[in-house]
Amino acid sequence: MSEELEINDQVLNQETDSADEPLSDEELDFVADTAISALKDILKYFNVGEVTIDEYEGDDGELILDITGDDLAVLIGRHGRTLDALQFLISVITVRIIGFRYPIVVDVEGYKSRQRQKLESLARSSAKKA
């Protein structure tokens, strides 16, 4: 991206959330296209080669962008910190462009869903012991 974006936490806390009304298919496509475009622009700087970005709607209505490709560990980072930062950037950029907040999850080859399953399994086993 050639433009500099001023990143500010206040952007993510705007009162212009879209939670009141569901988005039309065209609006959802625009949100997805905007987020994917921003993600592709940022991925150029990681030199990860050819990647595929799958988009789908999560259980809670969020837009999930799942990146697949070869040797993507650099996108996850230590304890998922790089992936969290990437998700934050994509959310901020998308909010700036579309004008309202829409939940976006950036994942790498299902990393976040695997981590969630591990945590749920640990919680169940801890609950049984208690």
Model regions and ranges:
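RNA-contacting regions in translation and RNA-metabolism proteins
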Residues: M1-A130
